[in-house]
Amino acid sequence: MPFQSSVGDYQTVATLETFGFLPPMTQEEIYDQIAYIIAQGWSPVIEHVHPSGSMQTYWSYWKLPFFGEKDLNLVVSELEACHRAYPDHHVRIIGYDAYTQSQGTAFAVFQGR
């Protein structure tokens, strides 16, 4: 008897980020994750891309990385500004760890159409 999934066809669903297999985050959970990025001393980086190119191309920076930024409200306002400027794009935030020179975390805040 074949397995019937109530979730859908997991093999064809594109996942954009660290939390891609979990239910969508609430606004409060997104704020908590951004606060975690800042608390770790990672640099918040905002990127965006049109959904048609999200798996084939590099994502574009929104401004420059926010090196040393400690203000959660500023990061959130820049995420919202990026989404207003590109409403049909995916918008994600990356926590860049300069010590290990790698991404500490990355997740989509807004998903495009």
From Swiss-Prot:
Compartment(s) where it occurs, according to its Swiss-Prot or TrEMBL record: Carboxysome
GO process annotations (BP): photorespiration; reductive pentose-phosphate cycle
Pfam families reported for this sequence: RuBisCO_small
Record-level Gene Ontology MF annotations: ribulose-bisphosphate carboxylase activity
Keyword check for Disulfide bond: no
Keyword Endoplasmic reticulum recorded: no
Main location: other
GO cellular component terms given for this protein: carboxysome
Coiled coil segments of this chain: none
Subunit note: Heterohexadecamer of 8 large and 8 small subunits. Forms a CsoS2-CsoS1-RuBisCO complex.
Function recorded in the entry: RuBisCO catalyzes two reactions: the carboxylation of D-ribulose 1,5-bisphosphate, the primary event in carbon dioxide fixation, as well as the oxidative fragmentation of the pentose substrate in the photorespiration process. Both reactions occur simultaneously and in competition at the same active site. Although the small subunit is not catalytic it is essential for maximal activity. There are estimated to be 152 RuBisCO holoenzymes per carboxysome.
HAMAP family for the chain: RuBisCO_S_bact
Additional detail: The basic functional RuBisCO is composed of a large chain homodimer in a 'head-to-tail' conformation. In form I RuBisCO this homodimer is arranged in a barrel-like tetramer with the small subunits forming a tetrameric 'cap' on each end of the 'barrel'.
Name of the protein: Ribulose bisphosphate carboxylase small subunit
UniProt organism field: Prochlorococcus marinus subsp. pastoris (strain CCMP1986 / NIES-2087 / MED4)
